[in-house]
C-alpha cells in the first residue's frame, strides 16, 4: 500500500467510525436514517486530518468498493455497520440463493449453537462471494472459516435480506438451520 493509499485508508476508517458508531463525539447529530450534514462532517474529519477537503471525502465515497457510504441532498451516512439504531431504506434482495459469512474458527461453536447474531451492530453482514467473506473474517484473526448461508431459508423464516451495497447484504439474524456449509 502506497502512502496515498495508506492516507486514504486511514481517513476512510475514521469516516466509518464516526458514521457507524460515534458521530456525537464529533458534535454531529445524525437523523433517524443516520445521515449527517456533509459540510459539518468534513469539518469533523478536519479535526484529525486538517488538510482534508470535501472533494477528498467525496472521492473516497465514490471509489469505495464496498459502498460503505451514501451521499444524498448535502448529507452523508454509512450504508451499513451501525452500532446505534438507524432506519435503512435499502432494497430487498429477493434473488440471492447462497450468501457467505466470514468469521474466525473460535466463534464457530457459539454460532452453530445460537446462529449468527449482529453482536454490537444492528445487522449481520453477509457477502455475495467467498473471497469477500474470507477477507471480512481475516479482520478478526487468521484462523478464518467461511459459512454458507441459504438465503431462501432466511426468507422462508421471515427475515428480509437487504442490499447494503453491490456485494454486501445485511439481515437481522441468521438461524442455525440456515447455515448450510462451512468452507
Curated annotation (Swiss-Prot):
It comes from the Archaea. Belongs to the KptA/TPT1 family. It holds the Pfam family PTS_2-RNA. Keywords: NAD, Transferase. One of its GO terms (molecular function) is NAD+ poly-ADP-ribosyltransferase activity. Removes the 2'-phosphate from RNA via an intermediate in which the phosphate is ADP-ribosylated by NAD followed by a presumed transesterification to release the RNA and generate ADP-ribose 1''-2''-cyclic phosphate (APPR>P). May function as an ADP-ribosylase. One of its GO terms (biological process) is tRNA splicing, via endonucleolytic cleavage and ligation. This is Probable RNA 2'-phosphotransferase. Its EC number is 2.7.1.-. It is an enzyme of class 2 (transferase).
